[in-house]
Structure formats: structure tokens, C-alpha cells
Design a protein with these regions (language model features):
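Glycine-rich phosphate/pyrophosphate-binding loop shared by adenosine-nucleotide-utilizing enzymes
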Residues: 21, 72-76, 105
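Acyl-donor-binding surface of acyltransferase catalytic domains
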Residues: 1-15, 84, 130
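Conserved GNAT acetyl-CoA-binding A-motif
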Residues: 126, 133-146
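A short beta-loop-alpha structural element at the N-terminal edge
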Residues: 20-34
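Helix-loop element at the rim of GNAT/NAT acetyltransferase active sites that forms part
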Residues: 36-49
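Conserved acyl-donor/pantetheine-binding loop and adjacent beta-alpha core of acyl/acetyltransferases
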Residues: 77-110, 117
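Conserved acetyl-CoA-binding loop-helix of GNAT-fold acetyltransferases
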Residues: 112, 118-131
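Conserved beta-hairpin
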Residues: 63-77, 81
Length: 150
């Protein structure tokens, strides 16, 4: 997938001048990287499992936005689409509930490896994810977040 389509220019605005950044949608090839970043960002009892990400990538890999620096995953946003406008616990657990025709884009995770946190990456990733949802004609997005993660 052509990363220029996603507008990586914001990386320069954040002070990242290296040329080896890429922004793209997810695939099963990203499973280990996504699972690793999740474990870096959340305590063991809160982190989604590798099996959970396997199912998510299978059902809605095109709703993962991944930022790589070379071959290292730095940040990702993921979530599925649904006709429901409220995010429920079941949605986190059952990737098959994804409905590509759904008018609502849920956001299940916003993850950035600790070495790159507090540098504006997550905010820009969310902006790009929102832009993509609008481009796809979604009515809105839903994100829940623990206060200490904001």
C-alpha cells in the first residue's frame, strides 16, 4: 500500500526527518509486531493477546493504521466498524462482529512504543484514522480511554 496516500508529512512537523517511515494498513504479517507493541503499552492483564490480534487482523486488518520506522512498528490504531454507536466489551472480544458497511468506526487501541510517546505521534495517528473514517463515509468514531492514558 502506498504510504504517501496517508500523508506522512506530519512526521516532519513533529521533528522526525529520517526518510524510512511508512504508514499503512495492517495485514496478518503484522501480527507479531502489533502484539509486541501492545505488550509494551499495557499491563499484562489489560493487553490484548496475540490470538485476539490474529482474529482482529483476519476480520478487519484494513482498519489497522500502522506507523513503521524501517521494520520496527512504532505506533498503531485499530478498531472495527459497526452499525452500533456505543462501544461494548463484547466488541473487543469478538472480531467477527465487524461490519464493513457499519456507519460507526470503533477505536479499540491507540498504541505508541514508550520511546516515542509524548512526542505527538498518537495524536497525529488519530487524526489520520479520523480522516480515513470520513473518507470511507463513516458517521462517527467512538473511542474510550482511561484517564491516565490521555
Amino acid at each position: 500500500m502506498d504510504s504517501s496516500r496517508f500523508g506522512c508529512s506530519w512526521l516532519r512537523d513533529l521533528g522526525f526527518t529520517e526518510e524510512n517511515w511508512s504508514l499503512r494498513k495492517g495485514s496478518m504479517e503484522d501480527l507479531l509486531a502489533v502484539s509486541y507493541v501492545e505488550k509494551e503499552c499495557f499491563p499484562p492483564l489489560e493487553a490484548a493477546t496475540e490470538d485476539s490480534f490474529r482474529e482482529r487482523l483476519k476480520f478487519y486488518g484494513n482498519h489497522f493504521l500502522l506507523l513503521y520506522k524501517g521494520d520496527q512498528l512504532i505506533s498503531f490504531v485499530d478498531g472495527f466498524c459497526t452499525k452500533e454507536e456505543n462501544l461494548t466489551d463484547l466488541m473487543y472480544e469478538d472480531a467477527s462482529l465487524h461490519d464493513e458497511e457499519g456507519s460507526w468506526q470503533m477505536i479499540f487501541g491507540v498504541n505508541t512504543v514508550p520511546a516515542y510517546q509524548r512526542r505527538g505521534i498518537a495524536s497525529k495517528m488519530l487524526e489520520e484514522f479520523i480522516r480515513m473514517a470520513k473518507e470511507e463515509g463513516r458517521e462517527g468514531l467512538v473511542l474510550t480511554c482511561k484517564k491516565e492514558k490521555i
